[in-house]
Amino acid sequence: MINVAVLGYGTVGSGVVEVIEKNKDMVNKKSAQELEVKYILDLRDFPGDPYENKVIHDFNTILQDDSVTIICETMGGVGAAYQFTKQALELGKSVCTSNKELVAKHGPELLQIAREHNCNYLFEASVGGGIPIIRPLNYSLTAEKIEAVNGILNGTTNYILSKMEKEGADFDTVLKEAQDKGYAERNPEADVEGYDACRKIAILSSLMFGKNVDSEKVPTEGITKITAADFEYANAAEYTIKLLGRSRAIDDDTAEVMVAPFMLPKDHPLAMVYGVFNAVFVTGNMLGDSMYYGRGAGKLPTASA
């Protein structure tokens, strides 16, 4: 029996519980052990929820329960999430997370703590939602010298740019529509100013180069200045506009990392990624180009990762 605790019962946290419960037989078969959600940590109560009896409010309950060996952190932020993750790893409990802000800021430290205490700190869900990209960079492409990573890493901005291109609409109109549909937050700053994509490309760059890339030092520009006229100009030249996180090796010790809107030829694979979908385009010195594509956000895709 593997007992799991889920930290946070919002969109992603409830998705994690749903994935584990719905795919329980398959997960148990693949892991050769029974997987069970024992605790759900949240400040709120959830009367009437199918799993309300698992909801607790004190993290110490999880820390003091030796039967809990895996923790799924879906809280977000770098305050309590950092403290809880650090405490869990120091007790030898493995942690997996969707928290890109935490990984971007404290990832190297938390990975080191995990190594020292013979457990794992896993963050596949922190970049690209359900797209498998962390493991490919870490394991599948071990023999590759990664020369560049270019990615559409934020579904909100890709949805907005796709609608602006197809309908000739202005930024503010499409943003409001995205908010009405739930694709954009009421405060969309992290998305539209590029901060979300910045944290993600910093994580990918750190894996790519084997050294920490500080997201706060990555030059970042969002999409708020893009206009319908920009798309008219791009279309006339057979180009489109995408917000990309870009990381390029200049030499063994130097990399160029940035987030900004770029013009792409319409026959480029990334130019064909529309709506809320994400994609990561990886260039290796032996493999050449490969692309990883899928839903970059959402309850179940992120929970699946």
Regions found by a protein language model. Give the residues of each.
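N-terminal glycine-/serine-/threonine-rich beta1-alpha1-beta2 phosphate-ribose binding loop
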Residues: 1-91
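Short glycine-rich anion-binding loops that position phosphate/pyrophosphate groups of nucleotides
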Residues: 76-78, 154, 264-265
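Rossmann-fold NAD(P)-binding glycine/threonine-rich loop
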Residues: 81-91, 100-138
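Conserved anion/nucleotide-ligand pocket segment
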Residues: 139-193, 197-199, 204
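A short hydrophobic/small-residue beta-strand
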Residues: 94-96
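Substrate-binding/catalytic subdomain of NAD(P)-dependent oxidoreductase enzymes
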Residues: 175-272, 277-279
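ATP-dependent carboxylate/acyl-activation modules
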Residues: 1, 6, 269-305
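Structural motif
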Residues: 7, 73-75, 98, 105, ...
